[in-house]
Each structure stands twice: as C-alpha cells, then as structure tokens.
C-alpha cells in the first residue's frame, strides 16, 4: 500500500578498504559521476521528501563533492553494521512516512524497481528486494515458511541447510517510520560479527504478524554492490551496454556499441551515426544526420543538423549550427561557436570565439577571444594573440576577410570587411575595410653561397 510521504536513507559510511584509495568508496565514479550520486538521483526521481545520507569515512570530501543542500547528513562515527547506521538516522523519521533504505555503493538500482517495491509494501509490513543467485555464497539467505518470508540469516550465521537457499537479501527495503524505529530499538549484536544487522527486523516484523512482501528487480545487476575496482569496472560495462542498447533501439547508429561511453545525457535527432571509442559527457544534443568520428569526446555541447565531426576531435561547451564540419584532431574549448556551414580543420583550437557562416579555419590555427564574420578564410598557422601575460583581449574580423598563412593578430585589434592580410603578417593595428595589409622582412639573395660542411 502506497503512503503519500516517503523519505530515503542512503548508507554511505564505509571506507572501501578494498578500493585501495584515499577517496571514499561511494565517490568513485560510474559513467562520469559518483556512485552515490546515481542513488541520490534515483531517490529524487522517486519523489523522496527527504534524503538522509549516513556518512563516516571521508565525510568532508563527501560534502564538498555532493554539495546538495537537500541532503540531511547523518554521522555514523563507528561502523557497527547496517542496523547501527539506520539507528543513527532513526531520530529523523516521521511516524507517518515510509522509509526506503538504499546503499551508496549499489549505483544501478532503477527508479522502476524501487517504485514496484514501494507499491508492493503491505500496510504495517515490509517491502523487501530479493534476488535468486546460482551461487549465493556470502549473502544473507531469505527464510520462508509456507511461502511467507520469515527472516534473513547472514551467511556466517547460517546452518548448512540454510546455505543451500538461493534467494538472498539485497539489503534494500521499505517500511513505515514508526514501525522501523520500534524494530531498530530492539536490535542486538548477538551474532558472529558483533554487529547490528538491519536484516533482523524481518524476523521482528514476522513475530508481530506483519507481512513481508518480496519483490525482484528487473535485472540482477541493479542490486550489485561495489567493493573493489574490478566490480566497479564490470558495472560500468553493464551500464554502458544498457545505454548503448537504448540508443540503438531509438534509432542511433553506434558502429561499435561495446566501445561507446555515455557519461551524461544524450539527446539525438534522426539518423545520427557515432563511430567507435566516442565519449559523451554532460548534456549533449546531436541534431538530425550528425556524424561523429572515431575517438571523439563531446561534452556539454549542442551540435546542429548535418554536422560532421571527424575522428579524434574534442568539443567542450560549444555550439555548432547546421552543416558545420570539424576535425580531424580539432579542439573546441568552452565558448566556441560555429555558425551554419563553418569549418574547423585539423589541429585548430578555438576558445571563446565565434566563427561566422561559411567561414573556414583549415589547419594549425588558434582562435581565442575572437569574433569572426561570415565567409572568412583563416590561413594555416594563424594565431590570435589574445593574452599579454595579465589580461585577455579580443580580435574582431569582419565578413569576407582573407587571412593568409602564418599570420599573428595581436589583440585588441579589428580587421574590417573585405580586408586581405598577406601571409606572414603580424597585425598590431586596426585594418580598414578592403585594405591589404602585409609586413615582411626584406628577402635577401646571396649568389654562390656555400653551405657549411661538417668536420670529420
């Protein structure tokens, strides 16, 4: 039966010794964000009125990283078991709300599974998430009597007969706040580990005649926890395979789904093609018929219709209008903007710069803090000299300008419409419309000159 109010407790106090890291275990990333953030996001989407985060090791780093004003931080100074962790959070529970218990190192739990668990929770009882494993070694076993759940026995406390049970406890459960506080107050540490097990509340509820409803997740991987980097890497591949499958089924052509990483949110138009070893980070939008070449990294960017990004290009915090072409080996840094039909070629870098409609920067160029008009040609080796060691300055280039190769534009400087900058020129003053500008050292010819010969 579904109550109108629900809060979530996320257990995240473990040190994660087997990660061999100074970083708290739950802050290790999966798909580009901390494991615990995945769990917080699921709780938020589920409609949690309050999220209580039980922390211990690395608490300050957790707070600095998560920076969520809506979290209620609950300290577990000593790690004395899951029951003890829940006891620390219990004073914050309202009697008339449901409490859902989650884990910061179980990052793939889905909102859909949690919603089914919430819906299945009996009035006055417990909703319990369980799975069946071929090899349940090390897990708490679900005990039943006449089909009804009667309790959970931890592996170290189980008899040989109980160890044959394949249904195991995932640790995820939901119960009423008042009931949970009562059961938590009755927990003891009379077990092999000397800890307070949250699982003991199942037997307490059964003894009171309360119903325990067991629910299975859509996928077993949803309940897989992380204790070491190998397990984390396996969950990463599971997650990425699921994302790739969703994209393929929605019409996106991934040339090699096993070599695609989504570390954020991707919105795609029709007939998008993505080659191998592409990484998508943050919020990325790809318009219709966009093609992304192998080895590209796209982060927090909008790519317009019919754009093509050639292999090994990096695009970050950039905006491309329709029919732009990028790369190979191009880099668009934050603030780069390409208007329709613009081209940025190999080994070109842009930062806080706008390239106008139909304009081209073909090779070996740096455009920083620049505003470039339409139909401009930027020759190879052009550099906007935007930094004087203390401050940044802007370069403005009008429409229909031709900039020859190996040109330096020393900002602040403006080049008027239709101007031509000869190859090898250093521009230090403003250029008027339709002017030709050139600066070169005299060319010297020495007839009969002999090249030096190496001494033997």
Curated annotation (Swiss-Prot):
It catalyses: alpha-D-glucosamine 1-phosphate + acetyl-CoA = N-acetyl-alpha-D-glucosamine 1-phosphate + CoA + H(+); N-acetyl-alpha-D-glucosamine 1-phosphate + UTP + H(+) = UDP-N-acetyl-alpha-D-glucosamine + diphosphate. Binds 1 Mg(2+) ion per subunit. GO terms for biological process: cell morphogenesis; cell wall organization; lipid A biosynthetic process; peptidoglycan biosynthetic process; regulation of cell shape; UDP-N-acetylglucosamine biosynthetic process. Residues 1-229 are annotated as: Pyrophosphorylase. Its EC number is 2.7.7.23, 2.3.1.157. InterPro entries: Bifunctional_GlmU (IPR005882), GlmU-like (IPR050065), GlmU_C_LbH (IPR038009), Hexapep (IPR001451), Hexapep_transf_CS (IPR018357), MobA-like_NTP_Trfase (IPR025877), Nucleotide-diphossugar_trans (IPR029044), Trimer_LpxA-like_sf (IPR011004). Pathway: Nucleotide-sugar biosynthesis; UDP-N-acetyl-alpha-D-glucosamine biosynthesis; N-acetyl-alpha-D-glucosamine 1-phosphate from alpha-D-glucosamine 6-phosphate (route II): step 2/2; Nucleotide-sugar biosynthesis; UDP-N-acetyl-alpha-D-glucosamine biosynthesis; UDP-N-acetyl-alpha-D-glucosamine from N-acetyl-alpha-D-glucosamine 1-phosphate: step 1/1; Bacterial outer membrane biogenesis; LPS lipid A biosynthesis. It is found in: Cytoplasm. Mg(2+) binds at residues 105, 227. Acetyl-CoA binds at residues 380, 386-387, 405, 423, 440. It is an enzyme of class 2 (transferase). Gene3D superfamilies: Hexapeptide repeat proteins (2.160.10.10), Spore Coat Polysaccharide Biosynthesis Protein SpsA, Chain A (3.90.550.10). Residues 251-456 are annotated as: N-acetyltransferase. GO terms for molecular function: glucosamine-1-phosphate N-acetyltransferase activity; magnesium ion binding; UDP-N-acetylglucosamine diphosphorylase activity. GO terms for cellular component: cytoplasm; membrane. Residues 230-250 are annotated as: Linker. The active site is at 363 (proton acceptor). Homotrimer. In the N-terminal section; belongs to the N-acetylglucosamine-1-phosphate uridyltransferase family. This is Bifunctional protein GlmU. It comes from Salmonella typhi.
